[in-house]
Design a protein with these regions (language model features):
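Glycine-rich phosphate-binding/catalytic subdomain of phosphoryl-transfer
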Residues: 59-225
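N-terminal glycine/serine-rich phosphate-binding loop of ATP-dependent small-molecule kinases
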Residues: 1-99, 154
Length: 225
């Protein structure tokens, strides 16, 4: 019988797993700090170590189950949240190939390029998504294209960190509007990605996951996850 709910949060400075009763009472929480390493080649960069950090996330999930003594079979649902604006890129096989935290600031030159290419684009992005260039995915994807073309060419999918958690637990790529819009490549009114924005500056289209509204069951946790 389903008795509890789990939330997993990939925050800026830490990851945590929290268990709640069906009435919303917090039953337990386990948290692990993580650090984002600067690539010495690129000032302002903050790389995300997906291998180590997934180990930390898993340890939090196991830890809160042990802390509370809850039977995993009695967890009715798992939801994910995360730091805004951080992104993960994947290749055609679904393997992570590049990721940066939300505090990454390496794409200053790309912001200047975007302004030069189209002085009105940032205003248009803000009208549609509520996002500006600051911390958004658009300049970062442009940076990867300019500075790491071999990674860019392999990129087949781009997700936010709450989407990454879902993918690691289920093998399914999915996203939701409240965080997808922080990419700046999203139309909040239509509740979907705006490929037109990406195409207007020569970026790939079709590399973002299917959108589902918050609260939608998008997949089931598998044994691998």
């Amino acid at each position: 019988m389903a008795k509890t709910l789990m939330a997993v949060d990939a925050g800026t400075g830490s990851v945590r797993a929290v268990l709640f009763s069906l009435e919303g009472e917090q039953l337990g929480c386990v948290q692990q700090e993580w650090t984002h390493k600067e690539d010495p080649r690129y000032p302002g960069s903050m790389d995300f170590d997906w291998v180590h950090n997934w180990d930390l996330a898993r340890s939090c999930i196991r830890g809160v189950i042990e802390q509370t003594g809850v039977n995993p079979r009695e967890i009715a649902a798992v939801s994910t949240t995360c730091m805004r604006e951080g992104i993960v890129l994947y290749d055609q096989q679904g393997q992570e190939i590049w990721a940066c935290a939300n505090v990454d600031a390496r794409s200053d030159d790309e912001v200047a390029q975007l302004v030069h290419m189209n002085p009105e684009l940032e205003k248009e992005i803000y009208r549609e998504s509520g996002q500006t260039y600051a911390l958004g995915a658009l300049p970062r994807l442009f940076w990867v294209k300019n500075k790491m073309p071999q990674v860019y060419e392999k990129t087949a999918m781009c997700t936010m960190f709450n989407d990454w958690l879902i993918y690691k637990m289920t093998g399914v790529f999915s996203s939701e509007p409240s965080n997808a819009c922080t990419t700046g490549i999203f139309n909040l009114e239509k509740r979907d990605w705006d490929d037109r924005i990406a195409a207007s500056i020569g970026l790939k289209t079709g590399i973002f996951p299917k959108i589902s509204e918050c609260g939608t069951v998008v997949a089931h946790v598998d044994a691998k996850g």
